[in-house]
Amino acid sequence: MKKIVLAVAVLLSLAACTEKSEQMKELAQMSLRQSLGNGQVKIIGISEPDSTFGTNYMRPDEKKAIIANMNRVTDVIMKRTKNMSVFNPEDSYTIALAERQMRANNDLRSMLYDSDTKGEWSGWKVKIDFEAKDGHNLDYRAERWFFLDKEGNVIFKTMEFPLP
């Protein structure tokens, strides 16, 4: 009898975790759609909620992936401008990509300098890769990180990095 009660308790806790995980992912998606406001968002992928230990804490593999993506974005900009020797002010795509990268650099610096110190558990993070249209109706790709409270009910910080 004890084994049956224990098995039911384990199954219920697994179901509750799965339900909470889905709720956090839905909250992040809703926040993304509302923040972009244009309704033309295509979700490419959503990570499972992961523990976070501060608002800038990233695991080493996450930092490495973000830096690699930012390097690829830089490569795209350099290729389109021939290493900045041929700048075309009419090239809206390159200008918009460079603007998104410059905005992301502040979060990147904070993440690199502050994320090595793993603090106390502060909640959850969810990453969404997506495609959307910017204010100039240009297609772009990005990843946005959502930092949620311990209960997974409130998003208290986001970071967005462009994707090439």
Regions found by a protein language model. Name each.
Residues I4-L14:
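Sec-dependent N-terminal signal peptides
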Residues C17-P164:
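Cystatin/cathelin-like cysteine-protease inhibitor module
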